[in-house]
Amino acid sequence: MSQMLHIEIPNFGNTVLGCLNEQRLLGLYCDVSIVVKGQAFKAHRAVLAASSLYFRDLFSGNSKSAFELPGTVPPACFQQILSFCYTGKLTMAASEQLVVMYTAGFLQIQHIVERGTDLMFKVSSPHCDSQTAMIEDASSEPQSPCNQLQPATAAYATSPSVPIPLLTRVKHEAMEMPPATGPGLASKRPLDTGPRDGVAVATGAAGTPGTAPLKLPRVSYYGVPSLATLIPSIQQVPYPQGERTSPGASSLPTTDSSTSYHNEDEDDDEAYDTMVEEQYGQMYIKATGNYAVQEKPEPVPLESRSCVLIRRDLVALPASLISQIGYRCHPKLYSEGDPGEKLELVAGSGVYITRGQLMNCHLCAGVKHKVLLRRLLATFFDRNTLANSCGTGIRSSTSDPSRKPLDSRVLNAVKLYCQNFAPSFKESEMNVIAADMCTNARRVRKRWLPKIKSMLPEGVEMYRSVMGASAASLPLDPEFPSAASQVFEQRIYAERRNDAATIVALRTDAVNVDLSTSANPAFEANEEVDGAGSVIQEVAAPEQLPADGQSSPQAFEQGNTSSSRPQTPVATATRRPEGTYAGTL
């Protein structure tokens, strides 16, 4: 048998995509042109179709080499989104977030819509008053402001061959102040009471205002720094606000077709993770070096603070979206308000949702009422709740009777809100969509069952091998809770004798073992009284069994007359060292 040679190039896909981006910038080998307000953008048809469901439907069955977008799409905004399709990086000003997010939703670019919109409201948290605030994974190490501004970052941002990071990062880029003039930073500071024009004033240690006002920092996705941060002498030039208009309704479909992006299978895996209940958390600067943050610092006067105060922007629906859907949304969305404000979805229903979450649903849905229903359901119900539910309670004869319907109070409020948004939306269609989401959630969870089985403790596999073929033939419950509960449950049905001693027989292929009440008093206390089939559960716990339960295996071993008998699960589970699997009978 000949040997097989395996060659693997790390980050090969990112390198190829970077080369395609270079070709696009040079105008080489491009097979399609996107015309926006008379300005043509050359690109590769395959890259656009892979990044945008809108372009995939547009290119389907159409061999034209030029396509024109609605005249209300701003060219500068489309240029940024086109660059994102090749690099996975998006940089925009804080005041342009809503327009960019809505344009990305119109083009059906899910990565921007689902990740960018969730981070949009985190950027301007009311307690985010540090010079640099980062949203990273929990395993990342604290970084000092000096380390974040290394020259290598500029090369990383400009080189197309650098692999795209897997985690989304958001940075606030602001002008660095001298370390000698910075006092200890307070953990909480009041909001800036200055004019709401997007300008924050930096003050020195002595209380003298800065020579020039600083613009609000630009938002950088995937850790791309702004040029003004790397080179402080260069000032940022804001984009013309007149061009930042949202796309019109000339190309928006008014009905959900079979190719709608929320009817695709690939959307089902992430539709339930886009909403986070507490997504407006506090972000503080990570103090390093000589700047230690006190637990209860003394209040510092506003005049002596040497950092930039970033206010929390108030949000409202864009005027371009209102012109398409009218005034069918929640009445509070048409006026500016705090994104963390709790709104009652329907008056008198008692079902509440934050302003930011509800606006996120409308920005993603646009004029599509079915997409709005899916987004609202994904906001109120997580994936596990949907997977363990039968939908609206209308179940078929083959459904598992243990599945309970979704909360009727929340479900009725969502239905009523969607009917107010689209009066022609039938309740039967809503029930089908809710049931379909539950089915998709179960299908996604079943994909992870082999991985969960591979992570089971060794005690479970040992126990099944000792119990023999009868116990091994019992499959794991496909609906058992996953890693969130940390409880692994295997049901074994035992027989119960009718005598007063209540002896449980554990039958295996090799031998029958009888545990009497005198030999195992702890087991008698835990034994269920009702029913003919008792259930024995295995619980994964780091601690050992209590002292009174450890005496039972010793008594059992003393009563053993044959050395050829296999060791019972009770004795094996008890002898395991601390920190491993412990079976509880």
Swiss-Prot record:
TM annotation in the entry: none
Entry GO MF terms: DNA-binding transcription factor activity, RNA polymerase II-specific; DNA-binding transcription repressor activity, RNA polymerase II-specific; histone deacetylase binding; protein homodimerization activity; protein-containing complex binding; RNA polymerase II cis-regulatory region sequence-specific DNA binding
Keyword check for Ubl conjugation: yes
Database matches in Pfam families: BEN, BTB
Coiled coil: none
Cellular component aspect of the GO annotation: chromatin; nucleus
Residues in BTB domain copies: 30-94
Task of the protein: Functions as a transcriptional repressor through its association with the NuRD complex. Recruits the NuRD complex to the promoter of MDM2, leading to the repression of MDM2 transcription and subsequent stability of p53/TP53.
Subunit structure: Homooligomer; mediated by the BTB domain. Interacts with the NuRD complex. Interacts (via C-terminal part) with HDAC2. Interacts (via BTB domain) with MTA1, MTA2 and MTA3.
UniProt name for this protein: Nucleus accumbens-associated protein 2
Species the sequence originates in: Rattus norvegicus
Taxonomic lineage: Eukaryota, Metazoa, Chordata, Craniata, Vertebrata
